Amino acid sequence: MDRFELIETIKCRGAVIFGTGFAAGMFMQILKERKLDGRVRYFMETAKSRETFYDLPVYSLDEAPLEQGGDPPLICAAVHDAIAGQIMPVLEKRYGSRAVWVYPMLSRLAFGDTIYTGDISVRDVIAAQPAENRWITVRYAALCGYRAAKDRGEVVSAYLKASAGDPDIGRRIYIKTQSRFSRPRTAEERLKRLWRISDDIASCGWKADPVLLDTDMRVIDGLHRLALAVYFGIGSINCELAKPSALYDSLFTGKNRITPAAQTDAGLTEKEIVFLDSMRSCLATRAEEGRKEHEKR
């Protein structure tokens, strides 16, 4: 099912959304923009964690109402790919072809088809990000912390110096900040996936899907890929560009972008905030080094 068929099916049959994290909220915002939020009947989770989400009831998988008669609604799994492998077999066993994984469609649903594809300097993408945002820095720091036990060199040394004897600080900040808009379990799985990908790159070389930006250089999808590209000294990265959308700021709030206010809300200590500031400088420096290395080739 592609995104066009998905929307038409929801218009006709309605939807139940599985998930109550960032992806589910993003999907609901997209449906609201299309005036289809009224077609959503309720939300589901594996184990119920709240009573309502977007003013609709939340049920556990075992407590969800049985649909009777007519065309039952789609079961739209709005979950990150880090946990989709665990979730989708359960939904498909219970709901068959009604279960659809919508996460891969979200960016295209929100921003439409891309208007450009090509390589863009990683340094330029990093430099274009607002100074207050720490969402790439947080991923980069967590990656450096993991690689510190495996690699040597200036990148790891800079991380260890910034960590001031606390090598776990990058992982800890990642979980704290990501858990503000995703389930802690999802945050943990996403981080483990980032680490696994870094191991693959270290063993087999660079390979990654394109990063999705808008023409204002705002990141839509690919924050982990950018962090990986900076760490491994990749000078330019394949990118797809979409037209800017008014949805951007409502989809990617301060919590997602990890602004100063979001850092405080996530419970970061003064030490952790100072560390992030230091790592932002390390990120910019390493991105510039990657550009220079690329130009020499």
Spans of features found by a protein language model:
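Short, surface-exposed amphipathic charged segments that create phosphate/polyanion-binding patches used
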Residues: 54-59, 113-118, 251-259
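Short alpha-helix boundary/capping and kink motifs at helix termini
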Residues: 165-220
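A residue-level signal for conserved active-site and pocket-lining positions in enzyme catalytic cores
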Residues: 73-76, 201, 222, 229
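Short hydrophobic alpha-helical runs that function as membrane-insertion/retention elements
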Residues: 237-240
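An acidic, glycine-rich, mixed-charge low-complexity segment common to nucleic-acid enzymes
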Residues: 79, 97-189, 280, 284-288, ...
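Hydrophobic, well-ordered beta-alpha structural blocks that scaffold small-molecule cofactor pockets
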Residues: 1-108
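Amphipathic, charge-rich alpha-helical segments that serve as recognition/docking helices
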Residues: 245-295
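A sequence-level detector for short glycine-anchored, His/Arg-bearing signature motifs
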Residues: 215-233
